[in-house]
UniProtKB/Swiss-Prot annotation:
The keyword DNA damage applies. Residues 80-175 form the Toprim domain. It comes from Bacillus velezensis (strain DSM 23117 / BGSC 10A6 / LMG 26770 / FZB42). The gene is recR. May play a role in DNA repair. It seems to be involved in an RecBC-independent recombinational process of DNA repair. It may act with RecF and RecO. GO terms for biological process: DNA recombination; DNA repair. One of its GO terms (molecular function) is zinc ion binding. InterPro entries: DNA_Rcmb_RecR, Rcmb_RecR, Rcmb_RecR_Znf, TOPRIM_dom, TOPRIM_RecR. A zinc finger (C4-type) spans 57-72. Keywords: DNA damage, DNA recombination, DNA repair, Metal-binding, Zinc, Zinc-finger. This is Recombination protein RecR. The keyword DNA repair applies. HAMAP family: RecR.
Length: 198
């Protein structure tokens, strides 16, 4: 169906979001058109504000509105332990359980040869640079329990094995093929408790 250009552009914009197909994009576009103008403007301002004012922490790679982020700045956190995760959403999921008190390192992806993503395309070099600090004694690999996450964890473990740093992998209380961001706090807590040394 032919829509007026402003609606077509709105539909196209929604389709750029993950998991949004043509039908959902049309529904969202018409929902937005039915909203009050001030609500739409607030929504648009929130999008622009988030894009302009958020950045990635120069230390750990977590999303933040200050650099370094609040986690890296917190002097009460254990700087001898780094938990390696794939995405900023995984940091948020780990923080929800309120049991982990170390630092994080966000890779911003996972090794995936099928998608053309190699070790140099994610933040592994930055991790290695951070580990040159003698203060770090343990690395917890909390990549997703899927093929890409496992490949990434194995690659990092092979790199770090000679360093003498204690390596562990979160336990598989998480469903294989799942993502950390969708796990509940109890499942994450059990997975962290049951991590194993590599």
């Amino acid at each position: 169906m032919q829509y007026p250009e402003p609606i077509s552009k709105l539909i196209d914009s929604f389709m750029k979001l993950p998991g949004i197909g043509p039908k959902t994009a049309v529904r969202l576009a018409f929902f937005v058109l039915g909203m009050k103008e001030d609500t739409v403007l607030d929504f648009a301002k929130a999008l622009v504000n988030a894009k302009r004012n958020l950045t990635y922490c120069s230390i750990c790679g977590h999303i933040t509105d200050q650099d370094p982020c609040y986690i890296c700045e917190d002097t009460r956190r254990d700087k001898s332990v780094i938990c390696v995760v794939q995405d900023p959403k995984d940091v948020i999921a780990m923080e929800k359980m309120k049991e982990y008190n170390g630092q994080y390192h966000v890779l911003h992806g996972a090794i995936s040869p099928m998608d053309g993503i190699g070790p140099e395309d994610i933040k592994i070099p930055e991790l290695l640079k951070r580990l040159q600090d003698d203060q770090v004694t343990e690395v917890i690999l909390a990549t997703n329990p899927n093929i890409e996450g496992e490949a990434t964890a194995m690659y990092i473990s092979r790199l770090l094995k000679p360093s003498g740093i204690k390596l562990s992998r979160i336990a598989h209380g998480l469903p294989v093929g799942g993502d950390l961001e969708y796990a509940d706090e109890v499942t994450l807590s059990k997975a962290l408790e049951g991590r194993r040394e590599l």
